[in-house]
Amino acid sequence: MKTTLRIVTRMLPAYGVFPLVFSFIFNCLVYSGSRMIAGGWYHHNIETGLDRSLPFVPQFLGVYFGCYLFWAVNYILIARQERHRVYQFFTGDFLSRCICLVFFLVYPTTNTRPVITDAGLWNQAALWLYSVDAADNLFPSIHCLVSWFCYLGIRGNQKVPVWYQRVSMVIAVLVFVSTLLTKQHVIADVAGGVILAELCFCIGRKTELYRIYEKFGSRIEQKILEFTEG
């Protein structure tokens, strides 16, 4: 355990370890926990005519699945920033999941997925995805929320090349498209995820809320330092 933490603290500053790890854990708890609670409840379908007119393009699952690597890389980059920037970002990140949890429980949504009868790699991948990921917890889209956070968190950071900031924005937009063309989400889900990311990121940056998180995180940081240096 000590060796693992030492390796991690070579990649990340000690103050970035807890916010990053907790972000992942809390995201899983919100997504899985809300499904356990509200899975059997009535779910609203907020599809529009435009959503139904969009084609099903299973090849976009390459983007949909590939975004997990994008998330990992960018969240690590964000956790390597200055202390106050790290806590500002992850305060917004935490707040966004709290709001997602409220929506998932108060106004659970679903959508209509296509009936897949054709064979082929991408169609089989879509069938597998549909079998393991129920059509719930859709509004706002966490896929779109996190992808936009990946861009917001490095936007304007002088330590991150401008070209990569732009690439991150493009990847985030491609993720939005992938959620629609794989019929995992509808347009309202995408818009909700982006708006929520912008709102919570702004709250993290413009208010003093992050100091509460920083105060708590600093205690864990000290424990990490004592453990790895002891």
Where are these regions (language model features)?
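N-terminal transmembrane-helix/juxtamembrane module of multi-pass inner/ER membrane proteins
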Residues: 1-71, 126, 224-230
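Membrane-embedded alpha-helical segments of multi-pass membrane proteins
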Residues: 25, 63-70, 142-146, 191-195
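Aromatic-anchored segments of alpha-helical transmembrane domains
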Residues: 28-29, 97-103, 170-181
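Membrane-interface loops
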Residues: 34-49, 79-163, 211-230
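Alpha-helical transmembrane segments of integral membrane proteins
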Residues: 61-65, 69, 88-92, 140, ...
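Hydrophobic, membrane-inserted alpha-helices
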Residues: 70-74, 147-152, 170-178
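Interfacial helix-loop-helix junctions of multi-pass membrane proteins
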Residues: 118, 135-139, 174-202
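Hydrophobic transmembrane alpha-helices
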Residues: 151-155, 197-205
